[in-house]
């Protein structure tokens, strides 16, 4: 917003978190009008570990819906496994959900993985070049060490697909068991400012950016 790309009712929107009436406001991103339907909900959840990404669990485990404070029938955009933390989008916008999760649209997801042991530049290169998993080859758009500790290393990875436990399996395939995994970003939306176990509504410009990157 601060770059002047978002306009509301003919004026630049520069205040993060500004509120507008989606049913009447004219919202533009990069000069292109964005239609945000008033009857659609768009939420961001900072998912804690221990919650499954489903509406109801036959085993009685806690689900992400237990954390969503809305009466609207929203659904997760893709999945995070129970042990994975971080950014999970929820919406009742079916077409947007379909496009955000379809490999054709190459929507980037950013993860911060903590693994045991030191991680070399060569190991990061292997993740980008691609590794073979049981369900086919997988590769990261980028993989970089962001923090080194005495016994553990943090690696940031960007992927454009969301196969089951893909990040964990990729790292395990090259010898690095994952001890903690957090998704920090989905497309243009990031996790900053949202405490674990809480949600916030997406701002109109964030909804607009999500629509834009998948051609809606």
Each model region followed by its residue ranges:
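Basic, flexible Lys/Arg- and Gly-enriched helix-loop patches that mediate nucleic-acid binding at interfaces
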Residues: 1-216
């Amino acid at each position: 917003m601060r770059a002047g790309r978002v306009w509301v009712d003919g004026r630049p929107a520069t205040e993060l978190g500004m509120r507008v009436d989606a049913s009447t406001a004219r919202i533009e991103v990069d000069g292109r009008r964005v239609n945000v339907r008033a009857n659609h909900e768009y939420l961001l959840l900072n998912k804690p570990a221990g919650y499954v990404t489903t509406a109801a669990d036959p085993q009685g485990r806690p689900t992400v819906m237990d954390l969503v404070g809305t009466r609207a029938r929203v659904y997760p955009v893709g999945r995070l496994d129970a042990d994975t933390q971080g950014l999970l989008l929820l919406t009742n916008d079916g077409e947007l959900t379909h496009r955000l999760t379809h490999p054709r649209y190459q929507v980037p997801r950013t993860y911060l993985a903590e693994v045991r042991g030191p991680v070399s530049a060569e190991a990061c290169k292997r993740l980008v070049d691609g590794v073979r998993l049981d369900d086919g080859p997988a590769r990261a758009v980028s993989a970089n060490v962001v923090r080194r500790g005495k016994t553990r290393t943090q690696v940031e990875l960007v992927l454009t697909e969301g196969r089951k436990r893909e990040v964990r399996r990729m790292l395990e395939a090259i010898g690095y068991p994952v001890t903690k995994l957090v998704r920090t970003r989905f497309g243009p939306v990031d996790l900053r400012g949202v405490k674990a176990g809480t949600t916030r509504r997406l701002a109109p410009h964030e909804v607009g950016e999500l629509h834009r990157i998948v051609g809606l």
